Amino acid sequence: MAVQPEVILGDITTLEVDVIVNAANPSLLGGGGVDGAIHRAAGPALLAACKQVLQQQGECPPGHAVITIAGDLPASAVIHTVGPVWHGGDRMEAQTLADAYKNSLQLAAANNYRSIAFPAISTGVYGYPKEEAAEIAVRTVTAFLTRYNPLERVLFVCFDEETAAIYRRLLASYP
């Protein structure tokens, strides 16, 4: 794995990377948490692009990902992925969350992007336990980078120090 994912504490909407990942809801029309923050920072162009995707493709199912323009964000594009709602772990949540990361990475690579920033998908209002979600994120991203690595920079952007510490500890256990 040539690229070692980085952990940063901060605001994903301010990052100068090729693509940021939005922890979206199926409608793609904005909501709370990081989804709302991205929509507010990106302005009306992002909402219009999401409405167009919704009109053409319908809602985005959990585990899937779609790409749009970034509007007023410094990033070039936004990949919207829908993570699972936590129901105790017995409804394929782990696989759906892994798919959200994997499909986002594949979409970034398919569009020739070199840098990507992820929030902690599903750990806000969707209630996924932070530790378990981080384990899935780190495992999925590092496996992708080991097998297929068109990316030069991968960031895990954490909203709080507790989450950042979890990611740092998990990444330290990977070569």
UniProtKB/Swiss-Prot annotation:
For biological process, the GO terms are: purine nucleoside metabolic process
Q: Which UniProt keywords apply?
A: Hydrolase
Q: Which SUPFAM superfamilies match?
A: Macro domain-like
Signal sequence, renumbered to the chain: none
| Top-level class of the enzyme under EC nomenclature | hydrolase
Q: PROSITE patterns under this entry? A: MACRO
Could you name the active-site residues? 35 (proton acceptor)
Checking InterPro entries in the record gives: Macro_dom, Macro_dom-like, O-Ac-ADP-ribose_deAcase
Looking at the record, the residues that make up the Macro domain are: 1-175
The Swiss-Prot or TrEMBL record describes its family as follows: Belongs to the MacroD-type family. YmdB subfamily.
What is the annotated quaternary arrangement, including any partners?
A: Homodimer. Interacts with RNase III.
Spell out the protein name for this chain. Answer: O-acetyl-ADP-ribose deacetylase
